[in-house]
Regions:
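Hydrophobic anchor residue at the start of the ABC signature
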Residues: 15
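Conserved catalytic motifs of ABC-family nucleotide-binding domains
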Residues: 22
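A small-molecule sensor/coupling module
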Residues: 97-100, 168-170, 187-218
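Helical segment within the ABC ATPase nucleotide-binding domain
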Residues: 41-53
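Conserved ABC ATPase signature
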Residues: 1-5, 9
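Regulatory nucleotide-sensing modules
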Residues: 89-147, 153-155
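Catalytic Walker B motif of ABC-type/P-loop ATPase nucleotide-binding domains
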Residues: 26-29
Length: 218
């Protein structure tokens, strides 16, 4: 009798029907909608089991607790795709700002060990790493190079100088492999950060951590 079957059980039955033909791909539209936490967790555990078997699960959801458990997130705003690196690097931004950045960001490729930012140079962009690694390098009193940080895809740099002013405090260069970055012009970065206090606070904490790292290296 349908009335004796819980919403969670109905959802499990629907998934079982969908998987009966052993498809390589399952598209689930709000699979945990209207479910309690326990039932929703069962659904996600089931999906994780399918993924372990080599299947692909595509979920449409507005639930942040689900997106935190996925391998990849794609955000759509007003029918347009937001660049994944922007959403990973600046997750606190409003979606409209993410979409704006997606449209104006510049893509650059740097070869291994190529300088991206020179110490004491001007910083005109906020950089987000799309692929590869970059090294943040300082020189000690004997002019020896000291790599104080190695940043990877989804991380950013250039924010210290853009927010605090002044010249670059370190050399930033590509790692051992080519690096792909997204570069956001200074004016656009500052304007949007001023409109997003939560993002400004999050970046501010990272700025302080990096300044502390520099002091330790000195």
């Amino acid at each position: 009798i349908p009335v004796l079957v819980s919403t969670g059980q109905q959802q499990l039955a629907a998934i079982a029907r969908a998987m009966a033909c052993d498809p390589p791909l399952l598209v689930a539209d709000e699979p945990t909608g209207n479910l309690d936490t326990r039932s929703a967790d069962k659904i996600i555990q089931l999906f994780e089991g399918f993924v372990a078997q080599g299947k692909t699960i595509v979920m449409v959801t507005h639930d942040p607790s689900l997106t935190s458990r996925t391998h990849r997130n794609i955000i759509i705003s007003d029918g347009e795709l937001i660049n994944e690196i922007i959403s990973r690097s600046l997750p606190q931004l409003r979606h409209r700002h993410m979409l704006e950045f997606t449209k104006i960001v510049e893509e650059h490729i740097y070869q291994p060990h190529e300088t991206i930012i020179s110490r004491d140079g001007n910083v005109d962009y906020f950089f987000m790493i799309r692929k590869g690694e970059v090294d943040v390098v300082l020189l000690d009193n004997q002019k020896n190079e000291n790599v104080i940080s190695r940043l990877q895809a989804g991380e950013f740099f250039g924010e210290i100088e853009l927010l605090r002013g002044g010249k670059s405090i370190a050399n930033v260069r590509a790692g051992d492999q080519p690096v792909e970055v997204l570069a956001l012009p200074r004016a656009d970065f500052i304007r949007v950060i001023n409109e997003s206090p939560i993002t400004a606070e999050a970046i501010g904490k990272i700025v302080q951590t990096r300044l502390d790292e520099r002091q330790i290296s000195d």
